[in-house]
Amino acid sequence: MRLKVAVLGSTRGTALQGILDEVAAGTLDVELVLVASDKQTAPILERASNYGIRAKFVDPSGLKRETYDGIVTDALREAGAELVLLIGYMRIVSPQFVETWHGRLLNVHPSLLPAFAGLMNQRVHEAVLAAGVSETGCTIHQVTEEVDGGPIVLQKRCSVLPDDTPETLKNRVQALEQAAFVDVLRKWSA
């Protein structure tokens, strides 16, 4: 039986593309059962819909974090999710959500954790360049109550080039994120 995977995302969901491509090619044996977002116009929803994956907007307006996460958990359970991936998800999940999905909740962070933990999106790449480090990458980690502090599942690395900008670095790291999620899903679905 194929592993049933759901994705939560708030942005473009670039890292999802690698998974979609591999599933469509028949080279990754998982079933994407749901892609949900807290942003109604998040491109990740269209990306999923284009592949026939159920896409759902869950409106967080006026809801406490715990209430919202409970609604999301209901949607994930209804979809039959066994593993949840956070891909560009710009919300901090509640302790109850972490407990409910313990061991089955993975996040991607655009740096080599623990370096640059707690930063999001473009700010990470700006900080990497400002720090003058020679390499960066991405980290897939289990989600715990400590932001970006869960056990590391996989890291992929790339060099920081002298002429890098935050955007060029982000593009290279996003390519690593796609490959990293595919690698992790291959191991988890074996």
Predicted regions and their residues:
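One-carbon transfer enzymes
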Residues: 1-190
